[in-house]
């Protein structure tokens, strides 16, 4: 299974119209494959939308996208609002739940870490051992690594009912000594991070994941 994460930077004050057009066009596009999630940024880089699509593999992605374009079902007419577009193919870790329609948020914290080249196996070993303890405090939405697009990236997404709940949950996990993951505490080789960023996302009205 793969997830395509498409991130678009859009012009200021265009979000409502962009989401409206995506939502309307998706009604025709969905017969080819279901949208996994559609978010916009609330905190972090502003004027940004992210849509996530789940596919069996790259071949299925190519086939579905070609059929949708040929049918005129996709993409939506939003070109006048788009400043920048990027697409990344993500592979889920073993600890990552399959994303399905439902309510987990409405606040989603997306944290993107860039690790040193070659350190993915070390990072994965630490996180797959550490996350089960973290899950005692709140659920995980996704844990992915990049296969195509920006390389050496690790993305983890955490849903919360409120921003206060986010802060309280992180404080409790930290106080319990289980978060953030520590390679030394787990007796595993240390991986190196070269960059970190986070953003708070909220779902559009038509997003299957709320």
Regions found by a protein language model. Name each.
Residues 12, 54-60, 116, 159-165:
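Helix N-cap motif at beta-to-alpha junctions
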Residues 34-50, 54, 72-107, 129, ...:
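Glycine-rich beta-strand-turn "strand-cap" elements at beta-sheet edges
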Residues 14-35, 67-74, 117-142, 165, ...:
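Short amphipathic alpha-helical segments
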Residues 1-58, 138-139:
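The feature marks the first
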Residues 56-66, 77:
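Short hydrophobic interaction/assembly module
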Residues 6, 18, 51, 61, ...:
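Hydrophobic pocket/interface hotspot
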Residues 4-7, 107-115:
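N-terminal beta-strand motif that seeds the catalytic metal site of vicinal oxygen chelate
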